[in-house]
């Protein structure tokens, strides 16, 4: 644990941001591996003579920031973790980084099933890091869930995230393409959810480098296939 004055930290932070990048991404770095939350950063201005306690040395944080600026690799991948809702999740380039907008899926479920003691049977198709299913499994402890993904590496990450986030055993993971692992659950599900690939090919080519060059293509590219399917139905 490194102790540093607020004034010294702010000088260092200003120097790092002068190299490039933005405040929001830098805050993610500090939160993920520096041990400084957004609340900590907001409170700094109150007492400039105070002390901060960092989990990592400034030199290490600086090297991670340098790698991000040099290669456009997402900070979350460089840190190996991300925070989503109240979860701390392991992420690698085998899984999509959970976005804040994805929280809306969980919120919609909460609005439909308001009783948290309800015994739901839910499934998630294309779970990735497991974020959505883990959030639901924790919120509805009496429920049972199954999360699928076509990528075994992604499922291993999702499983680790579940083990690290919960002492419960109400969620399991199955490898397979969309509905195929769920045939035995036919007629038993109360809820099926998914945040599927939806980016059309022409849009995918225009995505920022940090997305296109690092996040899994299979988790992003899907809009063209959906369009083809719709056209076939016509």
Predicted feature locations:
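N-terminal auxiliary segments of SAM/dcSAM-dependent transferases
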Residues: 2-79
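SAM-dependent Rossmann-like transferase core, predominantly class I methyltransferases
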Residues: 62-140, 145-160
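Conserved SAM-binding strand-loop segment of SAM-dependent methyltransferases
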Residues: 167-178
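Short conserved loop adjoining the S-adenosyl-L-methionine
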Residues: 178-186
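Short SAM/SAH-binding signature in class I
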Residues: 189-194
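Mobile active-site "lid"/loop adjacent to the S-adenosyl-L-methionine
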Residues: 198-226
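Conserved small/polar residues in nucleotide/adenosyl-binding loops
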Residues: 227-234
């Amino acid at each position: 644990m490194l102790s540093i004055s607020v004034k010294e930290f702010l000088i260092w932070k200003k120097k790092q941001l002068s190299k490039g990048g933005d405040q929001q991404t830098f805050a993610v770095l500090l939160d993920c591996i520096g041990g400084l939350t957004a609340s900590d950063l907001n409170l700094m201005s109150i007492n400039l003579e105070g002390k901060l306690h960092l989990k990592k040395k400034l030199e290490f944080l600086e090297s991670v920031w340098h790698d991000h600026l040099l290669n456009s690799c997402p900070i979350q991948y460089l840190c190996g973790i991300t925070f989503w809702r109240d979860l701390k999740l392991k992420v690698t380039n085998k899984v999509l980084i959970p976005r804040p907008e994805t929280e809306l899926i969980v919120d919609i479920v909460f609005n439909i099933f308001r009783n948290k003691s309800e015994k739901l049977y839910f499934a998630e198709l294309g779970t990735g890091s497991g974020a959505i299913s883990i959030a639901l499994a924790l919120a509805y402890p009496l429920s049972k869930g199954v999360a699928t993904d076509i990528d075994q590496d992604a499922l291993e990450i999702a499983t680790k995230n579940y083990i690290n986030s919960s002492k419960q055993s109400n969620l399991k993971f199955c490898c397979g393409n969309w509905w195929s692992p769920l045939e035995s659950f036919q007629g038993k599900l109360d809820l099926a959810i998914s945040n599927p690939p939806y980016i059309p090919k022409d849009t995918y080519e225009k995505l920022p480098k940090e997305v296109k060059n690092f996040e899994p293509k299979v988790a992003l590219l899907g809009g063209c296939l959906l369009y083809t399917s719709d056209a076939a139905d016509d």
